[in-house]
Amino acid sequence: MYAQAYFDYDSKKSGGVTMSHLRFGKSPIKSTYLIHKANFVACHNPSYVRKYNMVQELVDGGTFLLNCPWDMEGLEKHLPGQVKAFIANHGIKFYIIDGVKIGIETGMGPTRINTILQSAFFKLADIIPEDQAIDLMKAAAKATYGRKGDDVVQKNWAAIEAGAKQVVEVQVPESWKNAADEGLEMTHAENGRKDAVDFVNTIQSKVSAQEGNSLPVSAFKDYVDGSTPSGTSAYEKRGIAVNVPVWNSENCIQCNRCSYVCPHAAIRPVALTAEEAEKAPEGMKVMPMTGMADYKFAMVVSAYDCTGCGSCANVCPGKKGAKALAMENMEASAGEQKYFDYAVELPAKADVVAKYKENTVKGSQFKQPLLEFS
């Protein structure tokens, strides 16, 4: 048996896009190009179905596995029309699995879903008997994690078994054949420095959608020296998190530790004047700022920049045993993005930084982060 693997990935610190191209067969593999006619495609993040062309890379009758929390009603709502139409018109065998839910139930956690999806792959690909594949995966898990104790091994075994058992085949509706093409979700910048806005709209949006090869040479005429403007990651708004933090002001002690530990500056404290608080978007929660009666305090979250790591909620001391941050479903929390967008445009409050000192955790977090959305 011969095999060839190529892994295409971006430079993001967390939650980046990785595309794994795998070929195998009984003859030597001499292909020097990426796979564009696959027998099997799996999407491990449900937000990607609107951002990238994936099912279009399948041969007729191929298999598509989507990791998502949706039932049939959810699929109708979230799958873009071009995906529905391709699945229906090309006889694609469509399966779904809720890897995040399985990860939580088996103790692996919401982000460690690779083992679960790998088990589902072996069930659907029918390369080797399912029972044999599960046994081999279990043996590999024991060899890899045996030193960490039997508890870790058992969690991996449970995830492997659940991954194979909880795959659900989707009965594709006839109506999907006529679904309208909705296009890919691409970033469009309007506000900000002209050089950054032009770069995002001309190049970055296409490249981020894995459509960079379609750009003409003329698109790069302003960047012939290889330079690119800084600060453009703020426009990406990837929306890759499954769960994001939601702030409960009643339990907040305004320590700013959550902002301090966030690697992506996706959760920020903000000081608002009475006028700024009055003009804030409807529903934005504010509270009196401790030690500065002229200001209101708010903790704002950029759901579309958050990676869902949960570090902020973990470090939050809360009040009387109740945390001020809870990780909740991204879809339900996305409406709070407007609070973040409003807050980050407010002028800096130098007197607030002076009051709490820039060399303290609390004071430093009122300053502009210099590393964001990475």
Q: What kind of feature is each model-predicted range?
A:
Residues 1, 108-120, 254, 259-260, ...:
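Conserved phosphate/anionic-ligand binding catalytic regions in large, soluble enzymes, centered on
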Residues 1-207, 277-283, 352:
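Active-site cofactor/cluster-binding pocket
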Residues 133-134, 146-305, 313-374:
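Ferredoxin-type iron-sulfur electron-transfer modules and their immediate structural context
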